[in-house]
Amino acid sequence: MSEALKILNNIRTLRAQARECTLETLEEMLEKLEVVVNERREEESAAAAEVEERTRKLQQYREMLIADGIDPNELLNSMAAAKSGTKAKRAARPAKYSYVDENGETKTWTGQGRTPAVIKKAMEEQDKQLEDFLIKE
């Protein structure tokens, strides 16, 4: 809450501040505050009316489903079953580079993600190029 709102919300502080204003100024502020409060009330009632209308429509659709012999839970379950299909997995990328690690094992790398430390070290210290590690077909 801002300092101005804290002042407006505290009756003692508000009285102290009001002593410094004329009655005309206080009445003008009151009119403006009433306008703001009325606007807020209208917004709140409009939002409540929207919620009520939505609830009414949902109830109407539910009654229509029941009249047609369809259980709403059955409809929800069928929608969930249709939606819950697993995401298609993408194919693994083929290896593009081959290298020998510190343990003497031959490993491969697709070229995606971080460069393996062995390749990085060879490129920095031994002046090798990435093309030197390409898998030849």
UniProtKB/Swiss-Prot annotation:
Belongs to the histone-like protein H-NS family. NCBIfam families: PRK10947.1. PANTHER family: DNA-BINDING PROTEIN H-NS, PTHR38097. GO terms for molecular function: bent DNA binding; DNA-binding transcription repressor activity; minor groove of adenine-thymine-rich DNA binding; protein dimerization activity; structural constituent of chromatin; transcription cis-regulatory region binding. Keywords: Cytoplasm, DNA-binding, Repressor, Transcription, Transcription regulation. Homodimer that oligomerizes on DNA into higher-order complexes that form bridges between disparate regions of DNA compacting it. Interacts with Hha, YdgT and StpA. Its main location: cytoplasm. It comes from Salmonella paratyphi A (strain ATCC 9150 / SARB42). Pfam families: Histone_HNS (PF00816), Histone_HNS_N (PF22470). The record marks 12 as: Interacts with Hha. A DNA-binding protein implicated in transcriptional repression and chromosome organization and compaction. Binds nucleation sites in AT-rich DNA and bridges them, forming higher-order nucleoprotein complexes and condensing the chromosome. As many horizontally transferred genes are AT-rich, it plays a central role in silencing foreign genes. A subset of genes are repressed by H-NS in association with other proteins. SUPFAM superfamilies: H-NS histone-like proteins. InterPro entries: H-NS-like_N (IPR054180), H-NS_C_dom (IPR027444), H-NS_C_dom_sf (IPR037150), Histone_HNS (IPR001801), Histone_HNS_N (IPR027454). It is found in: Cytoplasm, Nucleoid. GO terms for cellular component: cytosol; nucleoid; protein-DNA complex. This is DNA-binding protein H-NS. Residues 112-117 bind DNA.
